[in-house]
């Protein structure tokens, strides 16, 4: 509402919610008898987003069903149906176990931590990030490559629980019901077959340190980080009900699996796993605990990851879908960028196929798609802000292959469009 002050400010308008004047805010929106500023509008939008997020996949008893979780994952992640099912069931069981563990004390339900194995760019991290977006439990991600044993330069294992505690706003009860995703878990494999050669503080030592918190223990967590503030009071966090999901590319594991297949194949009808003839994701389906042991994981660590989900290589069809179908698809992102210049960006179907083939050749999976599109659109994004009259840019297969330039279509339909398309 408008408030009247002194004679020099009698026409000054104020926000009816926070009381700030029109000079203190960027925008002041008028209603019949009230005013609201842009800051209050943004605050209201944040409140609505949080409510929508928490009610996204709720079902009876507040437990999201596996199908509901999987359906939301489908909106953001293309393919990997098996891994989605494993994650959806594990998360559903995690909720169900926590909600019903006090009702039947005769049978104690143990948690099942998950190991995700898949080639680079197959969607392991994206699956975890999407879970973080849709689940109403504290969630944190950790990078195994930064972890070391306590007392050495690097992050302590307890820092993972500290991050989860921070995600729960230091609410210990909520943190004890959370989910932790540890990425690059293959990078902490044992560096040598002989464990007594030297102390492996970033490999086997980290595996040993992770054992207790993954199985369940009461961890002493320093709220401000233990190394810089040694005198602070520690918080006690029980990790028994925290679900751990570990993911890694496990480069070279396919050779170990194939070697085992050759050594155990006897007779004319035996199947031989040949890495040169089969995709990495297909070979990962045959992984056994003994293969993980040979790779460098210690037996106790493998035993604490009873559920193993493997992700497949992404083929050309899947990569084309990744470019266009998810809600935050790369093509949609670049089209939005061009819309800011009032220009329509169009990709020919053959162009999307060429982009997918380039990613397959580079063996970078979906992670390499953005760098390919950046290289293709670099000159266009450099030129367009200085050009007038362009209403559409068309990317063809020849543009992706580097034999032609993008086609510029002008509003006046002049011959300049053809000139821009020439190599």
Swiss-Prot record:
<dbReference type="GO" id="GO:0051603">
    <property type="term" value="P:proteolysis involved in protein catabolic process"/>
</dbReference>
<protein>
    <recommendedName>
        <fullName>ATP-dependent Clp protease ATP-binding subunit ClpX</fullName>
    </recommendedName>
</protein>
<feature type="domain" description="ClpX-type ZB">
    <location>
        <begin position="3"/>
        <end position="56"/>
    </location>
</feature>
<keyword id="KW-0143">Chaperone</keyword>
<feature type="binding site">
    <location>
        <position position="40"/>
    </location>
    <ligand>
        <name>Zn(2+)</name>
    </ligand>
</feature>
<dbReference type="InterPro" id="IPR003593">
    <property type="entry name" value="AAA+_ATPase"/>
</dbReference>
<dbReference type="Pfam" id="PF06689">
    <property type="entry name" value="zf-C4_ClpX"/>
</dbReference>
<dbReference type="Pfam" id="PF07724">
    <property type="entry name" value="AAA_2"/>
</dbReference>
<dbReference type="InterPro" id="IPR027417">
    <property type="entry name" value="P-loop_NTPase"/>
</dbReference>
<dbReference type="InterPro" id="IPR050052">
    <property type="entry name" value="ATP-dep_Clp_protease_ClpX"/>
</dbReference>
<comment type="similarity">
    <text>Belongs to the ClpX chaperone family.</text>
</comment>
<dbReference type="InterPro" id="IPR003959">
    <property type="entry name" value="ATPase_AAA_core"/>
</dbReference>
<comment type="function">
    <text>ATP-dependent specificity component of the Clp protease. It directs the protease to specific substrates. Can perform chaperone functions in the absence of ClpP.</text>
</comment>
<dbReference type="GO" id="GO:0008270">
    <property type="term" value="F:zinc ion binding"/>
</dbReference>
<keyword id="KW-0862">Zinc</keyword>
<dbReference type="GO" id="GO:0140662">
    <property type="term" value="F:ATP-dependent protein folding chaperone"/>
</dbReference>
<keyword id="KW-0547">Nucleotide-binding</keyword>
<keyword id="KW-0067">ATP-binding</keyword>
<dbReference type="InterPro" id="IPR004487">
    <property type="entry name" value="Clp_protease_ATP-bd_su_ClpX"/>
</dbReference>
<dbReference type="Pfam" id="PF10431">
    <property type="entry name" value="ClpB_D2-small"/>
</dbReference>
<dbReference type="GO" id="GO:0051301">
    <property type="term" value="P:cell division"/>
</dbReference>
<keyword id="KW-0479">Metal-binding</keyword>
<dbReference type="GO" id="GO:0009376">
    <property type="term" value="C:HslUV protease complex"/>
</dbReference>
<feature type="binding site">
    <location>
        <begin position="119"/>
        <end position="126"/>
    </location>
    <ligand>
        <name>ATP</name>
    </ligand>
</feature>
<feature type="binding site">
    <location>
        <position position="18"/>
    </location>
    <ligand>
        <name>Zn(2+)</name>
    </ligand>
</feature>
<dbReference type="GO" id="GO:0005524">
    <property type="term" value="F:ATP binding"/>
</dbReference>
<dbReference type="InterPro" id="IPR019489">
    <property type="entry name" value="Clp_ATPase_C"/>
</dbReference>
<dbReference type="InterPro" id="IPR038366">
    <property type="entry name" value="Znf_CppX_C4_sf"/>
</dbReference>
<feature type="binding site">
    <location>
        <position position="37"/>
    </location>
    <ligand>
        <name>Zn(2+)</name>
    </ligand>
</feature>
<feature type="binding site">
    <location>
        <position position="15"/>
    </location>
    <ligand>
        <name>Zn(2+)</name>
    </ligand>
</feature>
<dbReference type="InterPro" id="IPR046425">
    <property type="entry name" value="ClpX_bact"/>
</dbReference>
<dbReference type="InterPro" id="IPR010603">
    <property type="entry name" value="Znf_CppX_C4"/>
</dbReference>
<comment type="subunit">
    <text>Component of the ClpX-ClpP complex. Forms a hexameric ring that, in the presence of ATP, binds to fourteen ClpP subunits assembled into a disk-like structure with a central cavity, resembling the structure of eukaryotic proteasomes.</text>
</comment>
<dbReference type="GO" id="GO:0051082">
    <property type="term" value="F:unfolded protein binding"/>
</dbReference>
<dbReference type="GO" id="GO:0016887">
    <property type="term" value="F:ATP hydrolysis activity"/>
</dbReference>
<dbReference type="GO" id="GO:0046983">
    <property type="term" value="F:protein dimerization activity"/>
</dbReference>
């Amino acid at each position: 509402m408008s408030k009247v002050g002194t004679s020099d400010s009698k026409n000054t308008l104020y926000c009816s919610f926070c009381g700030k004047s029109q000079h203190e805010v960027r925008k002041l929106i008028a209603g019949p008898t009230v005013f609201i500023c842009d800051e209050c509008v943004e605050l209201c939008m944040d409140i609505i987003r949080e409510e929508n997020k928490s009610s996204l996949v709720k079902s009876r008893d507040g437990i999201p069903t596996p199908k509901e979780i999987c359906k939301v994952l489908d909106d953001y992640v293309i393919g990997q149906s098996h891994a989605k099912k494993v994650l959806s069931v594990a998360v559903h069981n995690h909720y169900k176990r926590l909600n019903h563990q006090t009702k039947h004390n005769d049978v104690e339900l143990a948690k099942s931590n998950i190991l995700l194995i898949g080639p680079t760019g197959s969607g392991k991290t994206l699956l975890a990030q999407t879970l973080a977006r849709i689940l109403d439990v504290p969630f944190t991600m950790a990078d195994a490559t930064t972890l070391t044993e306590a007392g050495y330069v690097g992050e302590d294992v307890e820092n993972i629980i500290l991050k989860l505690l921070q995600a729960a706003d230091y609410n210990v009860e909520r943190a004890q019901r959370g989910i932790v995703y540890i990425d690059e878990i293959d990078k902490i494999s044992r560096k040598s077959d002989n464990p007594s050669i030297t102390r492996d503080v970033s490999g086997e030592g980290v595996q040993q340190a992770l054992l207790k918190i993954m199985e369940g223990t009461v961890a002493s967590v320093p709220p401000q980080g233990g190394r810089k503030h040694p005198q602070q009071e520690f918080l006690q966090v029980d990790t028994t009900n925290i679900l751990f999901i570990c993911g890694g590319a496990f480069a070279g594991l396919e050779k170990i699996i194939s070697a085992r297949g050759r050594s155990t194949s006897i007779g004319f009808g035996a199947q031989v796993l040949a890495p040169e003839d089969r995709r990495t994701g297909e070979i990962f389906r045959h992984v056994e605990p003994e293969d993980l042991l040979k790779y460098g994981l210690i037996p106790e660590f493998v035993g604490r990851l009873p559920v193993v989900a493997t992700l497949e290589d992404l083929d050309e069809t899947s990569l084309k879908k990744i470019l266009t179908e998810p809600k935050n698809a790369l093509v949609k992102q670049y089209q939005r960028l061009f819309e800011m210049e009032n220009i329509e960006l169009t990709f020919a179907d053959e162009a999307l196929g060429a982009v997918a083939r380039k990613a397959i050749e580079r063996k970078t999976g979906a992670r390499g798609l953005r760098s390919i599109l950046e290289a293709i659109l670099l000159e266009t994004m450099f030129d367009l802000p200085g050009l007038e009259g362009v209403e559409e840019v068309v990317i063809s297969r020849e543009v992706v292959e580097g034999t032609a330039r993008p086609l510029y279509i002008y509003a006046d339909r002049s011959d300049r469009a053809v000139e821009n398309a020439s190599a």
